[in-house]
Amino acid sequence: MRIIKYLTILVISVVILTSCQSSSSQESTKSGEFRIVPTTVALTMTLDKLDLPIVGKPTSYKTLPNRYKDVPEIGQPMEPNVEAVKKLKPTHVLSVSTIKDEMQPFYKQLNMKGYFYDFDSLKGMQKSITQLGDQFNRKAQAKELNDHLNSVKQKIENKAAKQKKHPKVLILMGVPGSYLVATDKSYIGDLVKIAGGENVIKVKDRQYISSNTENLLNINPDIILRLPHGMSEEVKKMFQKEFKQNDIWKHFKAVKNNHVYDLEEVPFGITANVDADKAMTQLYDLFYKDKK
């Protein structure tokens, strides 16, 4: 009987101890003791808006939130340093779905689950903001951010809908030495549509395509947008040289009417980001500045 009583007490003690440990673990998670490492700038900026601490940040020439100034860098978004990340003992390492295939070997070396979020469009980013809010106990902050973005988007769409004519827009995305043409599937293409512009490129299955200037002239857009991706000053000079030396550009309606605009990486960029409110507003003002 004594043995049975002893074993009963022992089992109860183990159950209570396990329950306490489980409860403690849950409370720890609820209190936000996550060790988060975002691998892209867009994710880093989003986590800042959600008032979340991080233990690692991507290496970037872009200005990151001041609250993260002392956070260790972990390398470029496409090539994070595995050992640098491991040292941080993260619970979550975050990336974006656009580069999911490229990031799989990285997560395999980390021996961790990969968390991927859609930042290809405003709608995709807003869904990701909700997911992050649910995942890291920031539902109120996520709702507030999405409500603000929805409010600005609705305001811009309503104003654009009242315009009698919508400009035809060509979007060039430049990197040092070359450029591509952006479609509606790209983030910048999505913003142009929201702001009331009509993308002259009708490709539906790719974000960016190559195209020669002769074909583009046949489309003859009202407005040309030039967006740099990395080394923005060098890309601006490249575009200026291209438009000056390639004689065909002078025949474009947009060039003749001085409707060629160089966009800044902030608030634009090639992936969705929390500065989308400013980007939508700037595009609308460019498209309809003569109709205010």
Curated annotation (Swiss-Prot):
Could you list the residues that carry lipid attachment of the S-diacylglycerol cysteine kind. Answer: C20
State its cofactor. Answer: heme b
Binding residues for heme: V41, A42, S60, Y61, M78, H229
User: Has UniProt tagged this entry with the keyword Heme?
Assistant: yes
In its UniProt record, which GO terms are filed under biological process?
cellular response to iron ion; heme transport
Q: Where does the signal peptide begin and end?
A: 1-19
Q: Where in the cell is it found?
A: Cell membrane
Offer an example of a GO molecular function term for this protein: metal ion binding
Q: Which domain of life is it from?
A: Bacteria
Check the record and name the Pfam families matching this protein: Peripla_BP_2
InterPro entries membership: ABC_Transporter_SBP, ABC_transptr_haem-bd_IsdE, ABC_transptr_periplasmic_BD
Fe/B12 periplasmic-binding domain mapped to chain residues: 35-291
PROSITE patterns under this entry?
FE_B12_PBP, PROKAR_LIPOPROTEIN
The terms describing its cellular component in GO are: plasma membrane
* Record keywords: Cell membrane, Heme, Iron, Lipoprotein, Membrane, Metal-binding, Palmitate, Signal, Transport
Q: How does it sit in the membrane?
A: Lipid-anchor
Lipid tethering residues (N-palmitoyl cysteine): C20
Q: Does the keyword Iron apply?
A: yes
**Co-factor: note:** Binds 1 heme b (iron(II)-protoporphyrin IX) group per subunit.
Induction info: Repressed by fur in the presence of iron.
PANTHER family hit by this protein: HIGH-AFFINITY HEME UPTAKE SYSTEM PROTEIN ISDE, VITAMIN B12-BINDING PROTEIN
| Protein role | Involved in heme (porphyrin) scavenging. Binds Fe(2+) and Fe(3+) heme but the largest fraction is Fe(2+) heme. Functions as a high-affinity heme binding protein and probably has a role in relaying heme-iron from cell wall-anchored isd proteins receptors to the probable permease IsdF.
The record's similarity note reads: Belongs to the bacterial solute-binding protein 8 family.
Q: What is this protein called?
A: High-affinity heme uptake system protein IsdE
Q: Which organism is it from?
A: Staphylococcus aureus (strain MRSA252)
What gene name is listed for this protein? isdE
